[in-house]
């Protein structure tokens, strides 16, 4: 699952694996969409995967046929969060393994919610007043539009502003939705498939406090 904090990237960002079929969902991105919109799109993907992919592969006589009993769900950044949530929301799909790379799994941390000037990947965002202006201007200009991909270089300044101003999670939660609450989902389901979490200790974009391993998983 493509990620980049639900803001940039697209479904073509994954390389190949031998002896595997790679299926990557395309979903709407922030800030044009909300977290609820993104989850609706991912829900539609899983429904399509289980109802349409097998017949599609058969009708086109693919050399490799999908085996939906052996699903490996991999995602980076926002996509890693979606991979974990997919297993929590759909235990009936029997996802076998999850790989989550530098994903924000726990949102209620100062790193994502409290505005503060900080260096991100060696770059200082614009000053707070200017950053807020850039965010509001982009949201106003893009109102009503739909975006499912974005060039990281084109969106980089906006991402810096959103991170510095602590606005990313508030944009995700414009439409309240229990599907966004990782701890709540895990308490409901009670377990996850085997999970490989990868996160850098010095990650300046999504700090390790967002990974929630000790808060939620253990």
Swiss-Prot record:
Q: Residue numbers of motif Involved in the stabilization of the negatively charged intermediate by the formation of the oxyanion hole? A: 7-9
State the Gene3D superfamilies in the record: alpha/beta hydrolase
Q: Which reaction does it catalyse?
A: a carboxylic ester + H2O = an alcohol + a carboxylate + H(+)
Q: A GO molecular-function term, please?
A: carboxylesterase activity
Which enzyme type, at the first EC level?
hydrolase
- UniProt EC number: 3.1.1.1
Claim: Hydrolase is one of the keywords in the record: yes
Q: Which Pfam families match?
A: Abhydrolase_3
Name the keywords, alphabetized.
Hydrolase
Keyword Transmembrane helix in the entry? The reply is: no
**Pathway(s) this gene product operates in, as recorded in its UniProt entry:** Secondary metabolite biosynthesis
Name the active site residues.
77
- Family statement drawn from the similarity comment of this UniProt entry: Belongs to the 'GDXG' lipolytic enzyme family.
- Name the job this protein performs: Probable carboxylesterase; part of the gene cluster that mediates the biosynthesis of squalestatin S1 (SQS1, also known as zaragozic acid A), a heavily oxidized fungal polyketide that offers potent cholesterol lowering activity by targeting squalene synthase (SS). SQS1 is composed of a 2,8-dioxobicyclic[3.2.1]octane-3,4,5-tricarboxyclic acid core that is connected to two lipophilic polyketide arms.
Specify the protein name.
Answer: Probable carboxylesterase clz11
């Amino acid at each position: 699952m493509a990620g980049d904090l639900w803001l940039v990237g697209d479904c073509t960002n994954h390389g190949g694996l031998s002896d595997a079929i790679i299926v990557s969902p395309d979903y709407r991105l922030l800030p044009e969409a909300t977290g609820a919109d993104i989850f609706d799109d991912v829900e539609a993907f899983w429904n399509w995967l289980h109802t349409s992919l097998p017949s599609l592969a058969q009708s086109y006589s693919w050399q490799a046929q999908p085996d939906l009993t052996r699903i490996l769900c991999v995602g980076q950044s926002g996509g890693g969060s979606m991979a974990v949530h997919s297993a929590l929301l759909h235990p009936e799909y029997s996802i076998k393994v999850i790989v989550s790379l530098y994903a924000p799994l726990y949102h209620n941390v100062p790193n994502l919610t409290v505005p503060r000037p900080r260096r991100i990947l060696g770059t200082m965002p614009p000053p707070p007043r200017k950053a807020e202006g850039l965010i509001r201007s982009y949201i106003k200009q893009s109102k009503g539009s739909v975006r499912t991909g974005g060039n990281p270089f084109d969106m980089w300044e906006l991402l810096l502003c959103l991170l510095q101003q602590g606005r990313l999670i508030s944009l995700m939660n414009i439409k309240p939705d229990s599907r966004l609450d990782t701890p709540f989902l895990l308490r409901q389901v009670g377990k996850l498939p085997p999970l490989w979490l990868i996160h850098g200790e010095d990650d300046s974009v999504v700090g390790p406090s967002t990974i929630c391993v000790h808060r939620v998983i253990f």
